[in-house]
């Protein structure tokens, strides 16, 4: 199959990478797993065993007229422990390479079908200035875009830092969440070739 390149000849690409069927269930699973892996999972609360304080019985069991009490660290007391205390945990989910690559291929194929993938020969700015990048995006009628290059261009990266709806990645930095988060994905021809090799 062929991808149209802005201002150049069409680029021949593999149908297994850019012409794959849309697999919503697989994409959902991989995106959820990716987001779960980004969770910090470090929250921690103290149980009644961990709260600082005496284990002494505050008053005798009977005869005071007050409710019976075993220690001041009871969860129903102010400053007591938490009943079901949250503990640090690993939220990551296992996704094998075949599934991950399949999801990326499925997303790229859907971007092609929806005409959200914009292929260019190269994408550069002459200096790390936001105004140069804004003008370049305006020329392509874009304002919400993920830009993928074969290797990370420092000028381009610095120029994009101040733009809310623009992100710059190299091929190694792409992930399923960023691919579906933007209206358009701008990709260079060199990056397309690298992605094909990476997902082969």
Curated annotation (Swiss-Prot):
What GO terms fall under cellular component here? ribonucleoprotein complex; ribosome
Sorted alphabetically, which SUPFAM superfamilies does this protein's record hold? Answer: Ribosomal protein L4
Determine the domain of life of the protein's source.
Answer: Bacteria
Q: Which GO molecular function terms does the record list? A: rRNA binding; structural constituent of ribosome
Q: Where are the transmembrane segments?
A: none
- Which residue ranges does the record annotate as region Disordered? 43-72
Q: Which UniProt keywords apply?
A: Ribonucleoprotein, Ribosomal protein, RNA-binding, rRNA-binding
**Which InterPro entries has this protein been placed in?**
Ribosomal_uL4, Ribosomal_uL4-like, Ribosomal_uL4_dom_sf
Entry function: One of the primary rRNA binding proteins, this protein initially binds near the 5'-end of the 23S rRNA. It is important during the early stages of 50S assembly. It makes multiple contacts with different domains of the 23S rRNA in the assembled 50S subunit and ribosome. Forms part of the polypeptide exit tunnel.
Q: How does it assemble?
A: Part of the 50S ribosomal subunit.
What the record says about family reads: Belongs to the universal ribosomal protein uL4 family.
Q: What is this protein called?
A: Large ribosomal subunit protein uL4
Its source organism is: Haemophilus ducreyi (strain 35000HP / ATCC 700724)
Question: What high-level taxonomic lineage is stated for the organism?
Answer: Bacteria, Pseudomonadati, Pseudomonadota, Gammaproteobacteria, Pasteurellales
Q: What is the primary gene name for this protein?
A: rplD
């Amino acid at each position: 199959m062929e991808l149209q390149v802005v201002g150049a000849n069409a680029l021949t690409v593999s149908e297994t990478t850019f012409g794959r069927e849309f697999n919503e269930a697989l994409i959902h699973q991989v995106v959820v797993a990716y987001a779960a892996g980004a969770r910090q999972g470090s929250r921690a609360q103290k149980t009644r065993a961990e709260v600082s304080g005496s284990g002494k019985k505050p008053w005798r069991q009977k005869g005071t007229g007050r409710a019976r009490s075993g220690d001041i660290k009871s969860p129903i007391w102010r400053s007591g422990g938490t009943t079901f205390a949250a503990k640090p945990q690993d939220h990551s989910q296992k996704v094998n390479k075949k599934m991950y690559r399949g999801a990326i291929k499925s997303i790229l194929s859907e971007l092609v079908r929806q005409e959200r993938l914009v292929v260019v020969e190269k994408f550069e700015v002459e200096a790390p200035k936001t105004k140069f990048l804004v003008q370049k995006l305006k020329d392509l009628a874009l304002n919400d875009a993920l830009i993928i290059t074969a290797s990370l261009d420092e000028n381009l990266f610095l120029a994009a830092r101040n733009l809310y709806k623009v992100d710059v990645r190299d091929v190694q930095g792409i992930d399923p969440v960023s691919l579906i988060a933007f209206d358009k994905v701008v990709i260079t021809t060199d990056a397309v070739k690298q992605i094909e090799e990476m997902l082969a």
